[in-house]
Amino acid sequence: MKISIPKPLGLFLAWMFTFIAISSFFYIMGAYNFCYLEQWQTFVYDSSYVSNTFMQPGGLVQLTAGFLIQFFHMPIAGILITAFLLSAIFLLMTHILKRWTGNNLLWPSALLPVVALAFMHFNTNYLYEGTLAFLLMLVGLTFHLCIRSTISRFIYSLCYTVFLFATAGSIASLYVTLLIIIEAFITPKKCAIYLLLILVVYLLAQYALWEGWFGEWKHALLADAYFTRRLPAGSAIHLPWGISIGLFLVGGLFRYLPNKPNLNRALLIIQGIVVGVFLYQGAPQYISKDNETFKELTCLIDNGQWDAIIDRCKDIPMTNLLHQNCFNLAFAEKDCLLQ
């Protein structure tokens, strides 16, 4: 007997499964990673700070990220909040690809940008607003595909490009790139008008540079904007963007695939293998567990759990000076250092 699952329930179950899987991944690979990130950022509850930040390109996601990160002093909070955002990104990406291609064959590949973003969160120099900006971009693409009129879609895209640059920053470049790819397959003869959005983003970036909001072009147009300015971003920061562009290029070809069960099954299996290989090969490359013990100790310090620090240090080698400092600090707080 065939069991029919209502669509809302199916979406909820898919989101819940993804949420649990991502939460488990974060917990296994670095339970105290997000707690460590919280100690490097401070959210200032001041009207002048909020207003000044909000007026800058990307100010909205920067304020939202700062507000969320303050809850990361509880290790589980950072894991659950980030897993929630990445699960939403996966569902939106799946919905966009399905609505655009007319089939649901690319849902395994929709995990690729999610995995890439998950890797970025283990880099302490990655800015949390990068994930929020990515989510906001997908929201724009979702509504774009709901508009049938070509002219209305372009007007909406123009307005949302300006809105996205103002609220989320350089992610507007990726938004315009994906829009051009989408429209090139939907309306090939009319997609040239979307090239004007490139000029719009360029002018917005130029204005931001004139105002001194950005110091370099790469911070106004590329993914480097979501990496700390103190260090060069490297190629890893461009991974989610590059994967997304490649995914949409492949998605355009999937629009013309014949609906054959054997072919569909083979494509799903191949995509599953690709995602598995990417996760298996990327985890050791982008995730380091060398400092996990130190992150755990700093989290305990942040929460004033001095007895827990002393007990934890009994089970770890004390040749590491950072571990020694944490141990001595706990003893000092307990007034036991001289003893």
Model-derived regions, located:
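N-terminal membrane topogenic signal
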Residues: 2-18, 101-106
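Transmembrane signal-anchor helices characteristic of membrane glycosylation enzymes that use polyprenol
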Residues: 10-35, 200-209, 276-280
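Membrane-interface coil-to-helix junctions
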Residues: 24-78, 85
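Membrane-embedded alpha-helical segments of integral membrane proteins
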Residues: 191-258
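Internal/C-terminal transmembrane anchor helices
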Residues: 262-286
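Soluble catalytic regions of membrane-associated enzymes that act on cell-envelope
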Residues: 281-339
